[in-house]
Structures are given as structure tokens and as C-alpha cells.
Regions:
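Acidic, Mg2+-coordinating active-site environments of NTP-dependent enzymes
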Residues: 48-58, 73-74, 78-181
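Hydrophobic/aromatic residues in well-formed alpha-helices
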Residues: 16, 181-182
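ATP-dependent carboxylate-amine ligase catalytic core
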Residues: 1-71, 89, 95, 118
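Short intrinsically disordered, low-complexity coil segments enriched in acidic
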Residues: 1-8, 150-153, 184
């Protein structure tokens, strides 16, 4: 349930049970993973809650990720690419970056954290191929976010916060007129 929140509040257990039972009763005709069920549950819950915006995190990668079924996002984010999930995503940083870059859609915008040179080249090539705009997280963006209270520990979380803030500013910037603290 901590994976699904609306306005900072976790989905109630009753809704997890109700939506989980609803989804388990459907014959999708394919084998779904736990991530697939959680994604479907989140989408149903967000629809019920009439969310204006959703932040959806991919599972392992990008290219073959279940989240691609949602369609073209207003903005995608690629965080720092490392060597995790090498058995699934690839044996070197360029292969892993190619998988992660699979979330870049035609004529879209993607916020990208600072990357290894090889990873960034792959991301830039994919963005160019898809006519996508890249917004790069800079040190000044990270510094601006350093005063935020984050729920997770680790210095890399400041980079993630900066990427999330840039994505929010991009998406909301077109329509947003509320107070600055709401973006934070």
C-alpha cells in the first residue's frame, strides 16, 4: 500500500483488498507479475480519486516495462543509471541505458539526471531519434532541493528530488498558478 499514494496519503487497506480482489477476478489471458497488478491497482485507484496528475515509476526498465501500456507521459524521468539488474537489463552501462531510454516516447520530454558519458550518449541518441526534448538535472537544481525534507535517505535522493521537481515544474508550468511550496 505504500506504493500507492494520493496527496501524500497511502491507499487505505480496504481499497487495496477491494481492488486486489477485483483484479484477481479478471482473466487477462496472460501471466501478470506482482508489479503489473500493483500498476493496475494504482491506475484504478487514481481514476477513482480523480487525480489530475499521476507519477508512475517503472518496474525494472523502460523499453519492455508494463508502464508503457499507459501511453505517452507528459514528462518522463531517467534517474542515475547504475549496474543494478544487469542480469535483466544488460551487461554494460550502454545496454542498461538503452533499456531505460525505452521510456522516451515520440515528441515527448524527458528529465535526465547526470549520467556516465556512455549512458548519456545512448539517452541522447534515443531522444533525438524520437524527437524528444531532454531537460538535464544540473548541480544548481540539486542545490535548490537540498533544503527539502525527504522521506528517503541517501545523497542520491537529492538528485532524484531535483529530477522530480524539474518534471513537476515542466508539467505544471504550463497550467500552474498555485504557491511554490506545492511544487516542493
Amino acid at each position: 500500500e505504500e506504493r500507492i499514494t494520493v496527496d501524500g496519503r497511502m491507499i487505505p487497506k480496504e481499497d487495496v483488498t477491494r481492488l486486489g480482489n477485483y483484479l484477481l477476478d479478471i482473466d487477462f489471458g496472460i501471466g501478470l507479475t506482482m508489479f503489473d497488478y500493483c500498476l493496475a491497482m494504482a491506475l484504478l485507484y487514481f481514476e477513482e480519486q480523480q487525480c489530475d496528475y499521476m507519477v508512475i515509476e517503472t518496474g525494472l526498465g523502460g523499453r519492455l516495462d508494463s508502464t508503457n501500456a499507459i501511453g505517452t507521459p507528459q514528462c518522463a524521468v531517467i534517474t542515475k543509471i547504475g549496474y543494478d539488474h544487469m542480469a535483466i537489463l544488460g551487461s554494460d552501462i550502454a545496454d542498461i541505458a538503452a533499456e531505460k531510454a525505452g521510456i522516451i516516447k515520440e515528441n515527448s520530454t524527458v528529465v535526465v539526471e547526470q549520467q556516465d558519458k556512455r549512458a548519456m550518449q545512448v539517452i541522447e541518441q534515443e531522444a533525438q531519434k524520437r524527437h524528444a526534448r531532454i531537460i538535464t538535472v544540473e548541480q544548481s537544481d540539486i542545490a535548490r532541493c537540498s533544503g527539502y525534507a525527504l522521506r528517503l535517505c541517501g545523497t542520491f535522493q537529492w538528485e532524484n528530488a531535483a529530477a522530480a521537481e524539474l518534471a513537476a515544474r515542466y508539467v505544471l508550468g504550463k497550467h500552474y498558478s498555485g504557491p511554490e511550496y506545492e511544487i516542493q
